[in-house]
């Protein structure tokens, strides 16, 4: 393919198309690979004699229908010197173009394809042009050329800076782009109005802000260029009679601008150029000469915002946005005494059930206890070395009561703790009850004496729990194997099986 190839007129065409020499070569012999299938299809489409074989689809841009597939395949085979060509092979070649995005099949229509001219028209390709001729059907699509793809409006002649600095915004580009022809004289009048004193100091302020922006935002790579001459889109806020104006009490008189109208608080006061500026130095509302906010003004401003939202159903997102505006705090500062009144107190986390019981019991015993009481040692659960029966426990509790009564303290805490521990972890019923259940004839004193004589016979709480779960026969066997002292007592006849030998054993098994 040649880059700058000449356009060769097809001698027998007459259809108005001009093909580049890479699409059609008159000197190419049959069978040469000088032409591609889509070039050949375009060639058939431009010929009037093949209108019954292949034609443009009516009403669609770039769409064509193959009316006689076998005839198109025969013509393509003759051109490529392949007599065995049929439509199956040709459609496979067309499917290759699907992946290349040159053309695609139209869904729902048989033998209908559509050229993707956006892909075909490439910058380094010469373009296929269509002449206005009666032979070409009206439905045939005009193949786009480079000039028809992009439309750039001509540069504005009224812009004073367009010749020197074409990349910058001009003063006329701030106005509406749709009024180019009708507003030419208005623009000239606006530019002449720029030369008065107010425009001069506006320009000075703009230059000052641009220099500050260049110093402050030097690290930003994509810095937006600022125009040299700029029209203020909105007049500066002055003495407006509108009661809902946010700046009704502003002492600054209004300046002339393009849109000298009372500004609604829901409109953006920042011009469009400033809205997207990367640094707050571009905004004309950041300088100290524009606004001096006092509490009354802020109150009025917030009230007008609320009115605009509630009365006109506006979204709060349409409020004025000032990119770099730092609102000073209100002057009525609170005294430090008042501010320290409302100190935040962090509450401790809620206590659990056991801690709650301890706190309640300590609160009950607090007013009665002596203030010089020794700190209570931490409760540590220890497995008892020698188990006692219920009576010995009661006796020790009574001794503790007497001891605490002598010291002048109430034993309610110890009793509460005893009850709490008993309630929190109920022990399994003892396997060898100290009091006989089934036989009233036996003396209970003798049994208790015998049991008190042997230390460490009653199992601890986890053992009790295990024994309660296992069957009585296995329990008896384990007890018999683990306790040689019990066997000696039973041999000597001192140990009583819950009162009456086998009967007591049977009742114990029945209870379990």
UniProtKB/Swiss-Prot annotation:
Residues where N6-acetyllysine is found: 388
Q: Where is this region: Disordered?
A: 138-196, 341-512
Q: What is its main location?
A: nucleus
Covalent cross-link Glycyl lysine isopeptide (Lys-Gly) (interchain with G-Cter in SUMO2), where:
381, 388
Bias class Acidic residues marks the residues at 443-452
Q: Which residues carry this modification: Phosphoserine?
A: 139, 159, 315
Q: State the species of origin.
A: Ateles geoffroyi
Here the segments flagged for biased composition (Polar residues) are 158-184
Which molecular function terms from Gene Ontology are attached?
Answer: DNA-binding transcription factor activity, RNA polymerase II-specific; sequence-specific DNA binding
Could you tell me which Pfam families the record lists for this protein? Ets (PF00178)
Assigned GO CC terms? nucleus
- The keyword Protease appears for this protein: no
Q: Whereabouts does the entry annotate DNA binding, in residue ranges?
A: 35-116
Q: Which UniProt keywords apply?
A: Acetylation, DNA-binding, Isopeptide bond, Nucleus, Phosphoprotein, Repressor, Transcription, Transcription regulation, Ubl conjugation
| N-terminal signal peptide | none
Instruction: Please give the name of this protein.
Output: ETS translocation variant 3
């Amino acid at each position: 393919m040649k880059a700058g190839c000449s356009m060769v007129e097809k001698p027998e065409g007459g259809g108005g198309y001009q093909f580049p020499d890479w699409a059609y070569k008159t000197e190419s012999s049959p069978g040469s690979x000088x032409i591609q299938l889509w070039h050949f299809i375009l060639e058939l489409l431009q010929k009037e004699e093949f209108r019954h074989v292949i034609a443009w689809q009516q009403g669609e841009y770039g769409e064509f229908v193959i009316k006689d597939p076998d005839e198109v395949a025969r013509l393509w085979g003759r051109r490529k010197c392949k007599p065995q060509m049929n439509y199956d092979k040709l459609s496979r070649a067309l499917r290759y173009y699907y992946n290349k995005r040159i053309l695609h099949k139209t869904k729902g229509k048989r033998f209908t394809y559509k050229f993707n001219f956006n892909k075909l028209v490439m910058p380094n390709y010469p373009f296929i042009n269509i002449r206005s001729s009666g032979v070409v059907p009206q439905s045939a699509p005009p193949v786009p050329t480079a000039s028809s793809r992009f439309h750039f409006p001509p540069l504005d002649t009224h812009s004073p800076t367009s010749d020197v600095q074409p990349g910058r915004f001009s003063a006329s580009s701030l106005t509406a782009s749709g009024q180019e022809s009708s507003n030419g004289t208005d623009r000239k009048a606006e530019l002449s109005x720029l030369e008065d004193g107010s425009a001069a100091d506006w320009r000075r302020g703009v230059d000052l802000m641009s220099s500050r922006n260049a110093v402050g935002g030097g690290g930003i790579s994509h810095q937006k260029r600022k125009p040299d001459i700029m029209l203020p889109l909105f007049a500066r806020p002055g003495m407006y009679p509108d009661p809902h104006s946010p700046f009704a009490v502003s002492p600054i008189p209004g300046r002339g601008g393009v849109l000298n109208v009372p500004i609604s608080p829901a409109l953006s006061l920042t011009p469009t150029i400033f809205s997207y500026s990367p640094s707050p130095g571009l905004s004309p509302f950041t300088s100290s000469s524009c606004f001096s906010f006092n509490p009354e003004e802020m109150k009025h401003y917030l009230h007008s915002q609320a009115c605009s939202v509630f009365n006109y159903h506006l979204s709060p997102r349409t409020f004025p946005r000032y990119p770099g505006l730092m609102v000073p705090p209100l002057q009525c500062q609170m005294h430090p005494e008042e501010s320290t009144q409302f100190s935040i107190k962090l509450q401790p986390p809620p206590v659990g059930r056991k801690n709650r019981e301890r706190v309640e019991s300590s609160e009950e015993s607090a007013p009665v206890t002596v203030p010089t009481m020794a700190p209570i040692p931490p409760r540590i659960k220890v497995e008892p070395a020698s188990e006692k029966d219920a009576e010995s426990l009661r006796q020790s509790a009574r001794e503790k009561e007497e001891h605490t009564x002598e010291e002048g303290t109430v034993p309610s805490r110890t009793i509460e703790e005893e009850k709490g521990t008993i309630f929190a972890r109920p022990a399994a019923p003892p396997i060898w009850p100290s009091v006989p259940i089934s036989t009233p004839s036996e003396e209970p004193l003798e049994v208790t004496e015998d049991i008190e004589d042997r230390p460490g016979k009653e199992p601890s709480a986890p053992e009790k729990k295990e024994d309660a779960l296992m069957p009585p026969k296995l329990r008896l066997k384990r007890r018999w194997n683990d306790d040689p002292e019990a066997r000696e007592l039973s041999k000597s006849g001192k140990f009583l099986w819950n009162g009456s030998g086998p009967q007591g054993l049977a009742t114990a098994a029945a209870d379990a």
